[in-house]
Amino acid sequence: MMRFSTNTSQQREEIILVEAADPYDLNRFVQAQACDYARALDEVRKGKKQTHWMWYIFPQYDGLGITSESKTYAIKSVAEAKAYLSHPILGQRLIECCEAAVAVDGKSASEIFRFPDDVKLQSCATLFAVVSSAGSVFARLLAKYFDGMRDEKTVHLMAITAPTGDSNTVC
């Protein structure tokens, strides 16, 4: 049993995570965010990303990145994306960061995140828009910064790796 303390903008939480109940090793994100989450959220709110946290704050689908960080923090399936979004810490944080990005006025995604992180943002929003309901913050983020367009590489990778009968439509 592992114990992690987290600090959110609203309250201090203590969550006990049992490794056996974490088939996707989502704890890797919780651990990575332990020191950087508040800073990442602050940078997004200010409309200027300055430090390095993109991989574990806005994760992408597996197969998009080539660095060790992108591989470590890649989401490998639709089921893992759903588990991430349902996680009591990670889902809330992802939504909070996406809401913060949507709330930034007068800047493009490339002005806030710079290349290539603006592309990673579109990939992340695409991934989680697929596993969320219409009108989600992920769809709103895509609408605001990417003319509603999903990242084609993410859609393609999700389509070719999705098991037969998956309940989410990737297209």
Residue positions per predicted region:
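Hydrophobic/aromatic-rich, well-ordered segments within soluble, folded domains that form packed cores
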Residues: 43-78
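A long, hydrophobic alpha-helical segment
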Residues: 33-45
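Short helix-capping/linker segments at secondary-structure and domain boundaries
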Residues: 63-69, 129-139
